[in-house]
A protein has these predicted regions:
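Conserved anion-binding
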Residues: 85-156
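Short, flexible micro-motifs
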Residues: 42, 51, 141, 145-148, ...
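Conserved N-terminal beta1-alpha1 strand-loop-helix module at the mouth
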Residues: 1-77, 81-82, 94, 124-130, ...
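Hydrophobic faces of well-ordered beta-strands that scaffold small-molecule active sites
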Residues: 5-8, 32-34, 63-67, 87-89, ...
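Conserved small/polar residues in nucleotide/adenosyl-binding loops
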Residues: 160-167
Length: 167
């Protein structure tokens, strides 16, 4: 399994967003990671679909859209229409996670699931083989520049070494 680098544009300088996207285009990065926050699921608000649309026009790499929002399933059509390849939703935001994962797949995107630092990896047992990837948050979601939570590395190692029927 080859690691995929997916730089987030969350910390980009929006006055120079096109330059930052160009830098990612010319890099070894595999994807462009876009964090969308609603101020409800997480305590901060980032950018919304107009910025996603702008990034989609400029990016030459697949878009990895990470929705830190309540009811992400409502936005599957918009995320798909704006060109996302991967749609990433939080385990904690989806009471019907299996349904949401299936809807993402049916829309033609790769479903991904994110867990917050305090969420046990075991919570993904029933869904792990239905998702393209798992994102383990190494900070509490909602703000950039936080201190890395070291115990999240154990979660990554556990996921990496767990047997999967897809391997």
């Amino acid at each position: 399994m080859k690691p995929i680098i997916s730089p987030s544009i969350l910390s980009a300088n929006f006055a120079y967003l096109a330059n930052d996207i160009e830098m990612i285009n010319g890099s070894e990065a595999g994807w462009v990671h876009i964090d969308i926050m609603d101020g409800v699921f997480v305590p901060n608000i980032s950018f919304g679909f107009p910025v996603l649309k702008y990034v989609a026009k400029l990016a030459e790499k697949p878009l990895d859209v990470h929705l830190m929002i309540v009811q992400p399933e409502k936005f599957i059509p918009e995320v798909k229409a704006l060109g996302a390849r991967i749609m990433n939703v939080h385990y904690e935001a989806c009471p019907h996670l299996h349904r949401v994962v299936q809807q993402i797949r049916e829309a033609g995107m790769l479903p991904a699931v994110t867990i917050n630092p305090a969420t046990p990896v075991a919570m993904l047992r029933d869904i792990i083989n239905d998702v393209y990837m798992v994102l383990v948050m190494s900070v509490n979601p909602g703000f950039g520049g936080q201190k890395f939570i070291t115990y999240t590395l154990d979660k990554v190692c556990l996921l990496y070494t767990s047997p999967s029927p897809r391997d």
